[in-house]
Amino acid sequence: MPIPTPYEDLLRLVFERGTPKSDRTGTGTRSLFGHQMRYDLAAGFPLITTKKVHLKSVVYELLWFLRGESNVRWLQEHGVTIWDEWASETGELGPVYGVQWRSWPTPSGGHVDQISAAVDLLRTDPDSRRNIVSAWNVGEIPQMALPPCHAFFQFYVADGRLSCQLYQRSADLFLGVPFNIASYALLTHMMAAQAGLGVGEFVWTGGDCHIYDNHVEQVTEQLSRDPRPYPELVLAQRDSIFDYTYEDVVVKNYDPHPAIKAPVAV
């Protein structure tokens, strides 16, 4: 059975056909607009194999989002520094992903816990077409250190299986997207477990899909490698989606090619 390669296919497409564009960071990119990737989560956990992805950072970042945090201190305490470039001297990032997921402000002064609401809706009305979580709070974007790149996601249940579709407005294909795929695949597994469902698909939809000009050498190396089978995710049982710990997430048979380092465009 051939190994699915939607990520590598998109990486190659943008590498070969992307339009040269300027960008906020001043680095320069080659870019294509609008693309979709689909992953059957029952067939394997989509942790990219053409380079090693730092799973510890993926897991701790997702747990940090689920905690509703706005400060990088908790990440740093667990050895994860992927948000440090955008944080203030005190570690603050403003009302970024986790804050919006867990504490979206309402006009009356209250807050909405979108994750709790999503779990409840999966349990009580799995066919709802309104099960959406958004980090794109227009009124609070000026206060954010970085506006959300992965902006909102929707859950869908069919035949007892949970699928998730993410819309990512800005997709750094080499550095960011492998993290995002793994993170939302993991979140889908967690949400499915909370609702007593199996897993279906993770659907990734990208807006500005780009490769930075200072990642060209690294992308060339990655595209020269043959993909390997995806690993298996084993997730511990937890009563609440907010109870998961790093030790609850076990990935078996991950056999990637070596990691490839590259600079982050800030």
Swiss-Prot record:
It catalyses: dUMP + (6R)-5,10-methylene-5,6,7,8-tetrahydrofolate = 7,8-dihydrofolate + dTMP. GO terms for biological process: dTMP biosynthetic process; dTTP biosynthetic process; methylation. Its EC number is 2.1.1.45. The keyword Cytoplasm applies. The active site is at residue 149. Keywords: Cytoplasm, Methyltransferase, Nucleotide biosynthesis, Transferase. Pathway: Pyrimidine metabolism; dTTP biosynthesis. GO terms for cellular component: cytosol. Its main location: cytoplasm. Pfam families: Thymidylat_synt. CDD domains: TS_Pyrimidine_HMase. GO terms for molecular function: thymidylate synthase activity. SUPFAM superfamilies: Thymidylate synthase/dCMP hydroxymethylase. (6R)-5,10-methylene-5,6,7,8-tetrahydrofolate binds at residues 54, 172, 265. It comes from the Bacteria. DUMP binds at residues 24, 129-130, 169-172, 180, 210-212. The keyword rRNA-binding does not apply. It is found in: Cytoplasm. Belongs to the thymidylate synthase family. Bacterial-type ThyA subfamily. Catalyzes the reductive methylation of 2'-deoxyuridine-5'-monophosphate (dUMP) to 2'-deoxythymidine-5'-monophosphate (dTMP) while utilizing 5,10-methylenetetrahydrofolate (mTHF) as the methyl donor and reductant in the reaction, yielding dihydrofolate (DHF) as a by-product. This enzymatic reaction provides an intracellular de novo source of dTMP, an essential precursor for DNA biosynthesis. Homodimer. NCBIfam families: PRK01827.1-3, PRK01827.1-5, thym_sym. This is Thymidylate synthase. The lineage of its organism: Bacteria, Bacillati, Actinomycetota, Actinomycetes, Mycobacteriales. The gene is thyA.
